[in-house]
Structure formats: structure tokens, C-alpha cells
Amino acid sequence: MIHHLFVLDFVMIIILQKRKRQNCMKAKILFRVLLTIICIAGAYPLISWMDSNSYKFRRFSGSFLVLMLAIPFLFSSCNSRNTKEEMQRITVKSSSDRIVSEWLDSIKVDVWAIHTDVPVAPIQSMDVIGNKCFVLDVFKRIFLIDIEKRLVLKSDITLGNARNEMLSPICLTADEEHVYVYDGMKECIFVLSYDLKLCQIVNTGCFFSTFRKIDNGFACLSMGSEQNFLFLRDDGVPVYSKQLSDKYPDEMQDGNPIQIGLDGYPYVKAYYSDTVFKWNGQELVESVQFDYGMGEPGGDYQKGSQLAHSGIAYTESYFLTNTHVLSSFVETDGRTIHYNLYDKENGVSCSGKMAPIDNVYFRATLQHGKEAYAVVLADEACVYGLKDIDMNNIVIIRYTFPS
């Protein structure tokens, strides 16, 4: 009878191992019922056998029985997973526009049109911290826009090959104290004060296309023949890298692949990728994956070329709140914007066009917690539904998500 019990234990352990891959509640309930039946079936003949033996042996066998029946549960405990940390899978499909409209109604929109005496060229990179907006235009000029004072300040740092000169600034980011401008030719980060004066130069020795300042370093995305995430320490030393996609867009887009979520953690989603990753301070972990019904195995996020051939050209923007995930894609014609909104609480995803919020369309670029921003020139304001904007104005749009 003892060896029969070992067999039962072995069967239960196998079932427990398979159970780890089960995510639905029905499977868990059926498993518990089956496990109870197996335990009872194995225990009953053993108890009858022990009754025919001495009291001392029955005491030993009883303890042995408890131990044997506890083994599968010990395996279950040691191999259990925290389902709250598992990747969230989103199946993109059409649904009622009611979900979209209700979510849009919960967003607050603020618009500032600020006059500038210095013409600003099309914006290449931007960041917003509080009432301060920092802009890098395609002419490699850096501007500070004070929203509260409605002033525009231009940096006096000149372009050149001298040590304290920028040769080819391509992106910027900011925190509560400094502005960080990355020079792609010199492969270094120029650290500026809020009045755009040079404070420090940090050598990186690596190339990337965009980055965000985060705790203890920089979250970066490099684009060459593929797209890779890099984490640099504050001293510019790269200490972590991960490939996110095997394809990159032919030209840079308006969206930002690195966003700061409501939880304060940075998230990254490469162009031509179906997976949003979260940086937990040590490594990237999968957070959200979009299923586009392509018949490919889940988690195959590196094969971005498959998305390029499926009619979805690239991700323009994505935003994560406590209740929703919004992503926008530009189709292969380069003009049609396709929105996907996922309702976490109701488990519903909606796909289609988005109505304006207070006559302003949602086309944000950058997310900082519960706020998302777009900075546009006057001639681009019509895309957002804004009218009668003076040509000497630069427009800042802030979208505030519900808490």
C-alpha cells in the first residue's frame, strides 16, 4: 500500500506542475476537486491497513500518511506564482464606441498658446516638468518654455566641435533639476541647468535615438538594424541591454517609445513591437502584450517585421493608466491613425477612431504619470482640432488622466 501512495503522490505532483500554466479559475477549481478525490482514494485503503497493525505502528503510519499527503501541497507552494505579476494579454478587436467615449469624457484637457519672438522649427524632441517645457527643434536649437510666465528662452550653446559645444544634439529629457541633451555624434550627454547653462558633460560611448531620465540613470532606446533598450547609470556607463524588435521605422515618428506610468516606473515599447515592457530597476519585464490575431505564438515580440507586413506600420504612441491602455498605430499608408483602447476592469478592447475631447483630439506624445503632453507649432494645431492659432505661437496641450 505504501508504494501505491508514492504513485498517487507522483501523479499529484505532475498535475501540480501542469497547474502552474493554468490561468483560468475553472481549471483551478477542477484541480482542487481532483486532488481531494485522489487524496481520499489513497488514504482510505492505507488507513484500513494500519488498523490491522499494532498501535505503535499505527502512530508511525499516521504521521507518515500526513507527510505523504502533504508532499504535493509543498510542491504546489514552492512552485506557485504571483499572478498579479504575470504579463497582461490584450486581444485587439472591435467593440462598442461607448467604452471609448466614456473614457475620453474622464480626461481633462488644458491648452496654452504661447507667443515666441524666436521662430521655432519643427520639434524633434521635448519634455515637460511641471510648468517648464523643454524643446529641441530640427535646427538643433534648445528652448525653454515657461508655461506659467508664458516666456520662451533660447539656449546660447553653440554648435561646433569644441569640448563645450554640441555637434549633433538629437534628443533631450529633463528631471526636477536639470535638462539632459544627448549628442549623437559625440556620444555624450550635455547636462544643463534650467536656465540652459552647461553644468556637466557625461560620456556614454554608445549611440541611442531617444531616452528618458529615471532614477539612478537613463532609459534609452537605440535604433540601428534592430531596436535595443539600454540602461545607463548617471555616469553614462551602460549596465543593461535587451533587444526589443528586429525592425525599425524608416523615419522617426512623433510617438515616444519610453513613457512614465502612473506607478512612476518607466515603460518601453519599441516600434514594430507587440509588447510593452516595464523597467523594475534591474531588468525589463513583460507588462502588456497586444494580440493582433496574426496566428503567431504569443511573446514573439522580436519579430517586428511580421507587424510591418500585417498592415500596422508602427506604434505612434501608447499610454497606460490604472484602468486603461491606449495605443495608436499608423497604417502602411502613413496617414491613417488607428486607435486601440483596452478597458482593464471590464476586459473589453475597442478599436477605431477617437472623438475629440472638448474639441481637442488626443494625440499626445509624452506621458509623465497621470499627465500626457503634446507640443506643436501653429501650423500643426489644426491636426488637433485647434483653430485660429497665431503663427507666432507655440502650443502646449496637457491631457490629465483620472487617478
What are these regions (language model features)?
Residues 132-137, 177-183, 216-223, 261-270, ...:
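Short beta-strand elements that form the blades of beta-propeller/WD-repeat-like
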Residues 75-77:
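C-terminal motif of bacterial Sec signal peptides marking the signal peptidase cleavage site
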Residues 289-308, 345-369:
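Conserved blade-ending motifs and adjacent loop-strand segments that build the rim/top face
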Residues 118-120, 157-164, 203-209, 244-250, ...:
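Short coil/turn segments at the loop-to-beta-strand junctions that recur within blades
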Residues 94-120:
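A short helix->beta-strand "capping" segment at the edge of beta-propeller domains
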Residues 111-139:
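Beta-strand-rich domains and repeat architectures in extracellular enzymes and scaffolds
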Residues 151-176:
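Blade-loop segments of beta-propeller domains
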Residues 122-125, 166-171, 206-213, 250-258, ...:
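Repeated scaffold domains used in trafficking and secretory/extracellular systems
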